[in-house]
């Protein structure tokens, strides 16, 4: 019988009753796979379970949930000493699963679990905001952030990622830009931004490719700004034919700094962070993550 590395699955409490997942884990255990399961109910649970994972000596901690769960587990993992840090696997169980989708993680529970347990680990970058808060996928600001944070849970549960678009169309009254200044290496822009995306990964908000050229192991952040010129016409052109829109500005840098004369909120993989000054930089190759061999986010 083949031997498999030991793993610990940290499961978001919203998915604790998933019968298909329960059956898949039972089948793995019947085939000799050692997989521990822990369920999160409140903030801080993931960090405690990773402490336990290190004590158990598991090779992989699997993030079972959406982008927020992946973010919480990745953040807790990079706080561990590199010598004892397990690799991270991904089991996409959230509403949008933006990072998992863009990374090519299988939608099938069985295939995703297999990849998370025995897939080859690649060293990936982690982004950090103001030397404190981290994200693995993307930081978004502006109209999209307000929509994502306010989309009702029942709508997300019923419709998944498309719920963000539907709720956005319902809340066009919120469509107002943020005035800010953005600096990076060989990059400077100042003006009114409708949407800002700073990507380590490529997509956010339920499938919107905000930073289509981003890679998670190239040491660079990708920036995309949707300016507010013409507002509604600009938004329509941007959504229907983004590569030809004059209202899009792109940039790349190892770091970006955003300064606003008023409070802004950025969504970091689902976690809101408010302020008037944000400095976003990269921690290169900070985490080993089990990804498909043909993962489009790897160079």
UniProtKB/Swiss-Prot annotation:
Enzyme Commission identifier(s): 2.7.1.-
GO cellular component: a single term: plasma membrane
Taxonomic superkingdom: Bacteria
Cofactor: Mg(2+); Ca(2+)
DAGKc domain span: 2-133
Main location: cytoplasm
Cell compartments where the protein resides: Cytoplasm
Pfam family for this entry, one: DAGK_cat
UniProt-annotated catalytic positions: 271
Positions of Mg(2+) binding: 215, 218, 220
UniProt signal peptide: none
Keyword ATP-binding: yes
GO molecular function: ATP binding; lipid kinase activity; magnesium ion binding
Alphabetical GO biological process terms: phospholipid biosynthetic process
Function: Probably phosphorylates lipids; the in vivo substrate is unknown.
Family: Belongs to the diacylglycerol/lipid kinase family. YegS lipid kinase subfamily.
Listed PANTHER family: LIPID KINASE YEGS (PTHR12358:SF106), SPHINGOSINE KINASE (PTHR12358)
Name used for this protein in its record: Probable lipid kinase YegS-like
Species this protein is from: Enterobacter sp. (strain 638)
